[in-house]
Design a protein with these regions (language model features):
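Conserved ABC ATPase signature
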Residues: 164-169, 173
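Conserved ABC ATPase "signature" region
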Residues: 88-89, 141-160, 269-270
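A short, proline-enriched helix->beta-strand linker immediately N-terminal to the Walker B motif
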Residues: 184-188
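Conserved ABC transporter NBD signature motif
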Residues: 78-89
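Short catalytic/signature loops enriched in Gly
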Residues: 14-16, 33, 156-160, 250-338
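P-loop NTP-binding/switch modules centered on Walker-like glycine-rich loops
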Residues: 55, 191, 195, 199-280
Length: 338
């Protein structure tokens, strides 16, 4: 009886909504092969928000575009990996299968709402199109659902504004329209690619607060792609730090910010203006990221490593992501961990 009661209390491990393993995406160009994403693995649990953070060109967006079949082929090609979404391998799925998932069960918010919205179509048409494609909903019923979606994201006078064109909205309001469009089909997973980059700080906070509010209301999971660690600290439970197409560190947000291990993560944190005293010179990471057309056989951060000990960085082989402590992973380069 004791054994039975103990067994009832044991909970099975949570099954990830999305489980990505060893994703590798490359671009075949005239100048050579660009190793944009190499052996990237991460998972997202139901209702969880994870962050993918790094500089421009680190592979953040390409990783997520690969999952939805949005990488143009050619020149792009997914060379290997697996991405299980509710038992479906997105990387092996047909375009027909992806169309039933993309925009319905997995939605995406892109960086620039002005270029993501069609300037020639009214908001009403752009909001109702996903309903028509994925749910067969048309006419007054679809229009009413679209109006409600605008009201849910805080757009005033939604019944009139829905007949406006994108240029008639401010930047912040356009981003709210993008959020409404992404969530109108009630997806299970939302990929938000730099959703607040082009907005001022006040509007940025409003948009991020809105995402949290809608996440709570709908119970969805979120992948937040950003270069801003301050945004990650306030919104994510797990964080993946990417550099030169690879994950260099991953941990819970609390662990990463209290005990960053990799020199690149520490450099990103040191670059946050709020960590400096008034009058101090702002820290910047020296140099530029490596040329991804060259597959490195050494530590790719060694030439920019001023936080750790660059003299100890690996020169004869590439570092691998290793579990340093419970649930905290980092590339095992001695110089970057110094």
């Amino acid at each position: 009886m004791i054994v039975e009661s103990w067994a009832l209390k044991v909970q099975p491990p949570a099954v990830p909504l999305l489980d990505v393993r060893n994703l590798t995406t490359r671009f075949h160009t005239r100048a050579g092969i660009v190793h944009a994403v190499e052996s990237v693995s991460f998972s997202v649990e139901p209702g969880q928000t994870i962050g993918i953070v790094g500089e421009s060109g680190s592979g953040k967006s390409v990783s997520c575009y690969s999952l939805l079949g949005l990488v143009p082929q050619p020149p792009g090609k997914i060379h290997s990996g697996q991405a299980l979404f509710d038992g479906i391998d997105l990387l092996q799925a047909s375009e027909k299968t992806l169309r039933t998932i993309r925009g319905k069960r997995i939605s995406m918010i892109f960086q620039d709402p002005m270029t993501s919205l069609n300037p020639y179509l009214k908001i009403s048409k752009q909001l109702t199109e996903p309903l028509e494609v994925h749910e067969g909903m048309k006419g007054p019923e679809a229009l009413q659902r679209a109006i409600e979606s605008l009201e849910e994201v805080g757009i005033p006078d939604a019944a009139q504004r829905i007949h406006s064109y994108p240029h008639e909205f401010s930047g912040g309001m356009r981003q709210r329209v993008m959020i409404a469009m992404a969530l109108i089909t009630r997806p299970e997973l939302l990929i938000a690619d730099e959703p607040s980059t082009a907005l001022d700080v006040t509007v940025q906070k409003q948009v991020l607060d809105l995402l949290r509010e809608r996440q709570k209301a709908l119970g969805l999971s979120i992948i937040l792609i950003t270069h801003d660690l301050a945004v990650v600290s306030e919104n994510c439970e797990m964080v993946n730090v990417m550099y030169a197409g690879r994950i260099v560190e991953k941990a819970s947000a609390n662990e990463l910010f209290s005990n960053p291990l990799h020199a690149y993560t520490r450099a990103l944190l040191k670059s946050i203006p709020a960590t400096h005293q008034r009058g101090d010179e702002l820290y910047t990471i020296p140099g530029i990221p490596p040329d991804l057309s060259q597959q490195p056989d050494h530590c790719s951060f060694s030439t920019r490593n001023t936080i750790g000990d660059s003299s100890r960085c690996l020169t004869d082989h590439r570092p691998e992501l290793t579990e340093i402590s419970d649930g905290h992973y980092a590339q095992n380069c001695p110089g970057c961990l110094a």
